[in-house]
């Protein structure tokens, strides 16, 4: 039984070494185990095999200021709550929003606000939200704020639109490319990256759907000091422009090494 448990854990939780977290100067710092999953441009593996992305860079800067050593752990997103409860990870820091989940976790204050829009193929003729009707299918990440608000019918989109939910951003992009759906709803950062890769194929709607706040999620029973410390440094990073500069580094066409959680 112990062997089986160990094997299952290995399949759902993988520690990847990070060059920025292995310096001699920080070897004695307390470790923050951060659960992440591939979600370009927030989290991905660059050409050197190291973690990169908006959330990775924000986490590294915040942890350095807070005197914490970040350890990024690749997880199966469906196992995130179990891994938190078991202590395999300390938090989730991967394009994750407290919207609809306020009471499910112990959250930091929001550190970033994203704009959500829709992308479609240029050849489809779909240019705006008004073009979405019952004949159209839209891709969203399963469990995302986009999915929940579409299902609730509280967006300015026809309630007849077909909603197709996928397990990751990569699957949403694949569905759009293969024509399984007509469009994809996600944060503008992800959509702009798609258009930057295929500028003659896709367009992002000029009209935006909503904004979504991001936070760092700890288990709801967490009683440590990390949240308080992170709130302090993230506030300072927002005030001094650090977070804005990090986001600007990943605007479409600036960084293209990504392989591409949710909004």
Feature map (PLM): residue ranges:
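Acidic, polar ligand-binding/catalytic clefts
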Residues: 56, 60, 64, 69-132, ...
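Periplasmic-binding protein-like
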Residues: 37-38, 113-120, 188, 192-235, ...
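Ligand-binding clefts/hinges and TM-proximal coupling segments of bilobed small-molecule sensing domains
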Residues: 9-15, 71-72, 145-166, 199, ...
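Extended ligand-binding regions for polar small-molecule ligands
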Residues: 53-65, 123-126, 130-136, 140-145, ...
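Bilobed "Venus flytrap"/periplasmic-binding protein-like clamshell domains
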Residues: 33, 37-41, 51-64, 120-170, ...
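Short, solvent-exposed loop/turn elements at domain surfaces
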Residues: 41-46, 101, 148, 225
């Amino acid at each position: 039984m112990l062997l089986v448990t160990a094997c299952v854990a290995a399949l759902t939780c993988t520690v990847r070494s990070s060059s920025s977290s292995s310096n001699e100067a920080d070897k004695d710092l307390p470790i923050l185990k951060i659960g992440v999953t591939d979600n370009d441009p927030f989290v991905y593996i660059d050409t050197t095999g190291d973690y990169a992305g908006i959330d990775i860079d924000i986490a590294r800067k915040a942890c350095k200021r807070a005197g914490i050593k970040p350890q990024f752990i690749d997880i199966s997103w469906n196992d995130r709550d179990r891994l938190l409860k078991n202590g395999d990870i300390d938090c989730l820091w991967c394009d994750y929003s407290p919207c609809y989940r306020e009471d499910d976790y112990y959250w930091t204050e929001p550190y970033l606000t994203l704009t959500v829009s829709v992308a479609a193929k240029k050849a489809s003729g779909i240019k705006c939200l008004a073009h979405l009707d019952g004949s159209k299918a839209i891709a969203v990440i399963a469990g995302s704020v986009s999915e929940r608000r579409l299902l609730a019918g509280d967006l300015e989109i026809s309630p007849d639109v077909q909603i197709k939910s996928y397990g990751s951003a990569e699957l949403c992009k694949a569905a759009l490319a293969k024509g399984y759906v007509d469009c994809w709803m996600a944060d503008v950062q992800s959509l702009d990256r798609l258009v930057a890769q295929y500028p003659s194929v896709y367009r992002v709607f000029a009209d935006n759907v909503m904004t979504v706040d991001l936070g760092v999620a700890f288990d709801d029973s967490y009683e440590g000091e990390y949240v308080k410390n992170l709130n302090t440094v993230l506030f300072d990073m927002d005030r001094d422009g650090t977070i804005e500069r990090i986001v600007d580094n990943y605007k479409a066409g600036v960084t293209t090494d990504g392989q591409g959680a949710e909004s």
